[in-house]
Amino acid sequence: MSLLILRGDMTLIQFRHGWHRSHRAACCLLLLAVARACADEIPVPAAQQAQPERGVELTEISVQAPEPKFVAPTRRDRIGRIWAPVLIDGKGPYRLVLDTGANHSAVTEHTAQSLGTSTSTDAPARVTGFTGSAMVPTIHASSIDIGAFALGPADLPVLSDVFGGAEGVLSLSDLKNERVFADFAHDRLEIAPSQRERAAKGFAVVPLHMAGGLPMAEILVGGVPTRAIIDTGAQSSVGNLALRKALARQTPRKTSREEIIGVTLEAQSGDSMPSPDIQLGHLTIHGMTVVFGDMYLFQHWNLTREPTLAIGMDLLGSFDVMIIDYARREMQLQLRPREASR
């Protein structure tokens, strides 16, 4: 797939994706997992115009250690998502998909077995994915560590192997004052206390707000104000029917059917079609393909009335560097140098 990106100064940027995109099944890992079968709706802010937020008050959190907590090599799996090496109860490292679109970490059945921890059916978790909901057993993890960065303890839902070869999913929803730095060009992942640094030269800035622990942005799709979920756990970008209806005059009549398989192994179909221009911060993206459908997750979160787009790695992985600064409430994106210089 080839994308064209226009910067704010209208300089043309072009680059290509470096991984295979299946036209038969786009496996989306964005999920909501709540331990002990207690499901909460994500509070959805009122629709806004696609412009930077002003006057946002951020809670100051004391950080004892200003040094980076974790720096390690990272890899993208065969469908383009990021996986990180994680120790669970001191064992591993296990390859977990780094998923900004998940509000709870989870592991596969094989990972649970290798940990030697018996699953609990007395305290099941309800897992809600893009395509459905299911009750699953859990295991208790006393510690979840990425380098020196600790995310545990936690009860982890145990899921079937739908992670494209990875051994689970790593949620970052508990981060409040941290900065996630993913350098795709050099296979580097860093999670560190945020120093509230402004974006460096050459980075585009996308303001974020948090809803249920998920990073969301206000963007424009074909000129239509759209709520965007930043989802590094999804292979493809998926839009709801409200967005498709708003774009009815701009989308082609010819579409192809694509199957979406969620973490519960239930499948739903959507229409895959070229998207109109997407304005993300000061960048304008041409040539995106989006799957539109009445997905279960949009219904669960009451995101059916307002145009909504879950942005996956088909777009996010096309940048050289992606930074999500939870303290500054913003995403910073760096274009590939050879493209930005054109």
Predicted region positions:
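Pepsin/retropepsin-fold aspartyl endopeptidases
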Residues: 2-11, 38-342
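Short linear motifs centered on Gly/Pro in flexible linkers and helix caps
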Residues: 5, 16-19, 36-37
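Bacterial N-terminal signal peptides
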Residues: 25-36
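Bacterial N-terminal signal peptides that target proteins for export
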Residues: 12-27
